[in-house]
Amino acid sequence: AASDVYKRQIQQAVIDGEKVSGVTIQQMGEGLDTGDMISKIVIPISPTETGGSLFGKLAQAGADLLIKTLPSIEQGTAEFEKQPEESPTPYAAMITKQMGLMDFRKSAEELERLVRGLNPWPSAYTFLNGKTLKVWKCKVSTEKTDAVPGTIFLADKEGIHTACGEGVLILTEVQLEGKKRMETEAFLRGYHIENGIVFTDHKE
């Protein structure tokens, strides 16, 4: 059972901004993911999809598809479709914790997808004043800034406004090392952020 867009990693489809994912029921083959396909279903990926929510959708869709497919296998009426020898479906790299490190030189849109794709595991993160800051939710802003990527140029009720290589990202739900996950408005009531502070890619 693999994604119809990426083989192996569900999160990657969200990270790369794909519009659909899916589940395939197939025979076991000699090689990795080479067996004939029996049935498949395509699942749309919503603009607010997270890796966790997509996993849940695919798990349910896969279970439903298997229940529908088993009778045809038992009765010998299932139709088998060979996979192309040169599969157009790319194998995604294994998801690691290191993939969650936010590189603010990237565009705000790319980083927003990274945050969604790695929620709930392994989570996107950056470093604020030498401490790990996990980012659980964020949104792309239409604001303009000439600040260096990674610079916090405003922290208010809306969130932590951060300059990116292209565009602005507003962090709306975060978790500082050793603290609970919380909406940014609540976080800022107990943690003062000076405008101009820059997120880093390492601890001090």
Which residues does each predicted region cover?
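Donor/substrate-binding cores of folate-linked one-carbon enzymes
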Residues: 1-91, 96
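Short amphipathic alpha-helical segments
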Residues: 41, 98-100, 167-169
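Short, flexible active-site loop motifs that bind/organize anionic cofactors or intermediates
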Residues: 44, 101, 177
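Acyl-group handling in specialized metabolite and lipid biosynthesis
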Residues: 93-106
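An anion-binding loop in the catalytic cleft
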Residues: 104-204
